């Protein structure tokens, strides 16, 4: 930030180290799941209709960030750009998208359409973040790019990614922003059970949501157990606007493959 004198002390350095760790962990997750199979995608050929809404929502987020990247770089607001990219890594990706999609990436068949689409989006995110972070994390992005690029070139010689305008979807953004609020409330209820030692991880829980008609319809097309990262989830209509969340320990046995608590574990699960 060139607009004021630089402030530095031990606490500030600790904060920056923690922020950098979050960014590195975001890249590490993508690299681990891509397993050296990074492939540049032709953004214009991406067929949004073939992707789940969650992936479409993340692509919308990339579109919004792309506009902000251009604006901040043109005005030399690198500190503002850094904060926005950090929040995207920590909140939208690590704590939300990656958390939900771990089960798909780790347990689904390598040939499943859902997993393939998830991997495509990881490729898109990785390529975009590498270029956007390049002016700020010069050496880190160069190191990562040298691992994934099949060409002997520098990340700093590449052009910026161009996000297609049709990835922007304000209606979908509003829907998933509201879904995110429901997830936050559910996470709080689950965390209380974890704190009291009634359950360990969230996958040991089953939840029952009592919600009004608006929120009920909002969750209609959502795999509730996958979205809330629990073993079982149900919803029922309520006349109250306030969400009521009942969290209990799931009944059954732990599946060694997906770690969910299933009443009957079989090879077909």
Could you describe each region identified by the protein language model?
Residues 1-49, 149-150, 198-201:
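Catalytic adenosine-cofactor/nucleotide-binding cores of aminoacyl-tRNA synthetases and other
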Residues 18-29, 56-64, 83-103:
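Core structural elements
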Residues 36-67, 98-189, 196-211, 234, ...:
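Acidic, turn-prone loop/beta-hairpin segments
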Residues 245-251, 265:
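Short, flexible, mixed-charge glycine/proline-rich loop motifs
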Residues 259-262:
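Cys/His-coordinated zinc-binding microdomains
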């Amino acid at each position: 930030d060139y607009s004021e004198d630089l402030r530095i002390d031990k606490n500030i350095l600790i904060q920056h180290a923690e922020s950098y760790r979050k960014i590195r962990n975001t890249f590490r997750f993508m690299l681990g799941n891509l397993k050296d199979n990074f492939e540049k995608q032709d953004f214009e050929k991406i067929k949004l209709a073939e992707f789940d809404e969650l992936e479409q929502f993340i692509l919308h987020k990339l579109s919004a960030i792309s506009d902000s990247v251009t604006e901040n770089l043109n005005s030399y607001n690198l500190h503002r750009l850094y904060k926005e990219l950090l929040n995207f890594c920590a909140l939208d990706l690590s704590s939300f998208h990656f958390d939900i999609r771990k089960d798909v990436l780790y347990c689904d068949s390598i040939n499943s359409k859902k997993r393939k689409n998830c991997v495509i989006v990881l490729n898109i995110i990785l390529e975009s973040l590498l270029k956007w972070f390049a002016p700020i994390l010069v050496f880190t992005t160069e190191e990562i790019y040298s691992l994934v690029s099949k060409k002997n070139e520098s990340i700093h010689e590449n052009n910026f990614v161009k996000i297609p305008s049709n990835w922007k979807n304000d209606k979908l953004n509003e829907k998933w922003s509201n879904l995110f609020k429901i997830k936050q409330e559910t996470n709080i209820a689950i965390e209380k059970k974890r704190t009291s030692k009634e359950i360990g991880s969230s996958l040991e829980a089953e939840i029952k949501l009592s919600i009004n008609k608006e929120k009920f319809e909002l969750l209609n097309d959502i795999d509730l157990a996958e979205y809330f990262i629990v073993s079982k989830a149900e919803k029922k209509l309520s006349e109250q606007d306030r969400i009521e969340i009942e969290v209990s320990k799931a009944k059954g046995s732990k599946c060694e493959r997906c770690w969910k608590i299933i009443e009957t574990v079989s090879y077909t699960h």
